[in-house]
């Protein structure tokens, strides 16, 4: 499980909580967020500022209607540099602060050193202001001692970072869900058709969603 799975389950969380949101998928190689939640997410090209500007436009569209909307962006790894330039050149964090919009950076951590280095780079790039959510992704490792003992995590915690755990979903169930481009709601509720989840598979997905939602409930979303 990677960052796109996290974006998908976050989207499902917002749907189940009846919280309006718009989603954007910057990963041109897979576009799985837009594929699994096509009614809520659309691809966005990060090679141009015009493409990235669409993301912030969603906040402006939602102002004044008394129904604030969140935006979920699935960021591909290769988008870090153009994203940072766009944020800096647009003074985006200050602008969103003036609009009353909280910025949440999610760092999906695996058990390796590269993940720690990426967190360090994220903190050094944006510093104080945004919320930082560090997610220990058990789908990509189980020994997070490098992260726990790192200076990067200490710096993140000093800025108020929250640390949660994303449990691993049973692999066979995840493969079936991916094969059919199914939302997590569809995975739990569909009972007919080829290769649908069996009763106990659906139960395991329900438990995984419940555990994940409990972790999300601890965050200022």
Locate each region found by the language model.
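Conserved glycine(s) of the Walker
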Residues: 1-2
């Amino acid at each position: 499980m990677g960052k796109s799975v996290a974006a998908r389950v976050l989207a499902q969380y917002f749907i189940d909580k009846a919280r309006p949101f718009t989603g954007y998928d910057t990963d041109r190689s897979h576009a799985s967020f837009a594929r699994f939640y096509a009614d809520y997410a659309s691809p966005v090209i990060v090679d141009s500022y015009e493409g990235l500007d669409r993301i912030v436009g969603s906040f402006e569209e939602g102002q004044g209607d008394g129904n604030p909307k969140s935006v979920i962006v699935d960021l591909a790894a290769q988008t870090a540099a153009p994203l940072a330039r766009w944020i800096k050149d647009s003074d985006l964090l200050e602008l969103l602060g003036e609009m009353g919009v909280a910025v949440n950076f999610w760092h999906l951590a695996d058990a390796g050193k590269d993940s720690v280095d990426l967190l360090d780079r994220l903190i050094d790039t944006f510093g104080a202001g945004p919320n930082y959510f560090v997610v220990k992704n058990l789908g990509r490792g189980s020994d997070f001692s490098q992260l726990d003992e790192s200076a990067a995590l200490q710096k993140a915690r000093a800025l108020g970072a929250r640390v949660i755990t994303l449990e691993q979903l049973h692999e066979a169930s995840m493969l079936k869900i991916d094969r059919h481009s199914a939302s997590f709601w569809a995975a739990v509720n569909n009972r007919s058709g080829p290769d649908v989840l069996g009763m106990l598979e659906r139960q395991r997905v329900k438990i995984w969603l419940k555990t994940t939602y409990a972790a999300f409930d601890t965050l200022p979303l």
